[in-house]
């Protein structure tokens, strides 16, 4: 009992540490220049305290701890405030806090000249808190609060520089695409309420219903919107219009992994539903390949990293599709470290080059930004799944499991090609941004000696090297791993990754001296993001607008305002006058007869005189 009390008190301390800076916003401290420092310190302390219950939980061998507070009863349904602390939430909380701590410290350097930096830090903290609510929720209502919370905070943070049209458009785009996903979530909530009369996860899992395709498809739609899967993915690269710390937090430990986390939470329902698994697998495979293709030809450093996130999210969805939720969760945790670090390194480069994001205008940075360069290379290698870095422990396992599971060969092939492309676009970033000769303005002064820049990247660098081993050692698998495997399957992931590296280097070296006279169709497809934004954002609105214009002009103007009223009145008037009178309305003839009469009268008067 004492262990549980200590456990509960340490968790409460962690969460209260996070809410303290929010409470301080109502005092004069919020106007103080040291407020960002307070927020950063609060998160660092919360991380250190959160390690205590996590360590206790892992080594005590518990399955989960659920705390329940009755809130209200609506007719027959009981609504509770219920927190579920299992392996997933207990490991994710310290990871999210650690990554956010580093991002907050980096923000103090990156956003130092922003007049509203205190508000920025408050928004970032609220973003983290809503994610914590989502992760620890034990019922759909709390999950929905966290879900909508990360949605609205992402809108406020992506549109932070609201004086720019692009930032406003990107923020609105993020909200609108997520609205489509939210429809699926609300549909699933309504279905569970009507059919099972509960929103509690445990009660949903134990109540056997014959056909769960409708709510599961709703949840998959919700995950597609939030985790930027194919079809609802265009908002993710657009979200790069926000400040770099926002991109780092959005892509590492909050918003985008929420969709994958939702599917992990509801995995017990999907476990024996083959239709749902196949749909999830195919969606993930298409996403991971399509976004990897798009990343190959982008020139904006942040957009390349954004597409790599979408590709990794596709890989996580593939993992859920092959019935391995613990592996998907492991990839969420390992991905958070190196993805946050990649964004912080790109932020360091962008800030030092006076907000230049085009990799064609960089080059030679290994001489002037040695620490950033080292971190970027380690992060890129971790992303590609280089052995014994963080990414290897999850990515290699996922591909091995996919190779040996009863999956369809098509989805597996797409995933392997996408893995190869990951190495290709990572090589491209390193080649263009870091190597060769400088291609930027020589007047730029570059300095990476601020501890606010070095320390967070250093922490994430250590995480990108060691975290994978530590986390994989402490996550218990939910299914029996493959005992035996042929050598060629074991080395498949490494082989395709090395192939990607070699091809990318070969292409980069070739394109230095030779350039395509006319870009190929494949290049256009990749560079224009598969024509997706053009079709969705240009062609479809144009069709809708032209149809509405025709309806307005034909239906309203021509038919109602012209034909139905004035013309019909004149037509009926003419018909009735022709029917009633003998006169045919030949006005020229009438005038002629009138003139003839007048002339005859004049002639008679003249002759009389």
Swiss-Prot record:
The chain crosses the membrane at residues 3-23, 41-61, 90-110, 115-135, 140-160, 174-194, 214-236, 244-264, 276-296, 304-323, 328-350, 368-388, 410-432, 460-480, 491-511, 585-605. InterPro entries: NADH_DH_su5_C, NADHpl_OxRdtase_5_subgr, ND/Mrp_TM, NU5C-like, Proton_antipo_N. Its EC number is 7.1.1.2. It is a multi-pass membrane protein. Its main location: mitochondrion. Keywords: Electron transport, Membrane, Mitochondrion, Mitochondrion inner membrane, NAD, Respiratory chain, Translocase, Transmembrane, Transmembrane helix, Transport, Ubiquinone. GO terms for molecular function: NADH dehydrogenase (ubiquinone) activity. It holds the Pfam family Proton_antipo_N. It is an enzyme of class 7 (translocase). It is found in: Mitochondrion inner membrane. It catalyses: a ubiquinone + NADH + 5 H(+)(in) = a ubiquinol + NAD(+) + 4 H(+)(out). One of its GO terms (biological process) is electron transport coupled proton transport. One of its GO terms (cellular component) is mitochondrial inner membrane. The keyword Protease does not apply. The keyword Cell cycle does not apply. NCBIfam families: NDH_I_L (TIGR01974). Core subunit of respiratory chain NADH dehydrogenase (Complex I) which is composed of 45 different subunits. Belongs to the complex I subunit 5 family. Core subunit of the mitochondrial membrane respiratory chain NADH dehydrogenase (Complex I) which catalyzes electron transfer from NADH through the respiratory chain, using ubiquinone as an electron acceptor. Essential for the catalytic activity and assembly of complex I. PANTHER family: NADH-UBIQUINONE OXIDOREDUCTASE CHAIN 5 (PTHR42829:SF2). This is NADH-ubiquinone oxidoreductase chain 5. The lineage of its organism: Eukaryota, Metazoa, Chordata, Craniata, Vertebrata. The gene is MT-ND5.
